[in-house]
Amino acid sequence: VLIIAVLFLTASELVTADYTRDKWQYRAASLRDAMRNFRDTRCSPGGEVCTRHSPCCTGFLCNHIGGMCHH
């Protein structure tokens, strides 16, 4: 009976540790996506002025000579 109890406790600790690791990976991915979305809310779309403080949105490049975002 003691051996069965030890095996059960060991198995439950392994399952809990695996679940916790997956939970942290999900949180890290969510934080990364939130930061990416935050950056895109401060960006300049195509045809708008781009600066050091307001870079072009994803998919656009800043023409530093004229300071305009373009494809």
Swiss-Prot record:
Primary residence: secreted
Gene Ontology, cellular component aspect: extracellular region
Kindly give the InterPro entries that the UniProt entry links to this protein.
Conotoxin
Residues that make up the propeptide are 18-41
- One GO molecular-function annotation for this sequence? toxin activity
Keywords annotated in UniProt? Disulfide bond, Knottin, Secreted, Signal, Toxin
Give the record's family classification. Belongs to the conotoxin O1 superfamily.
Q: Under which name does UniProt file this protein?
A: Conotoxin LvVIB
Q: What is the lineage of its organism?
A: Eukaryota, Metazoa, Spiralia, Lophotrochozoa, Mollusca
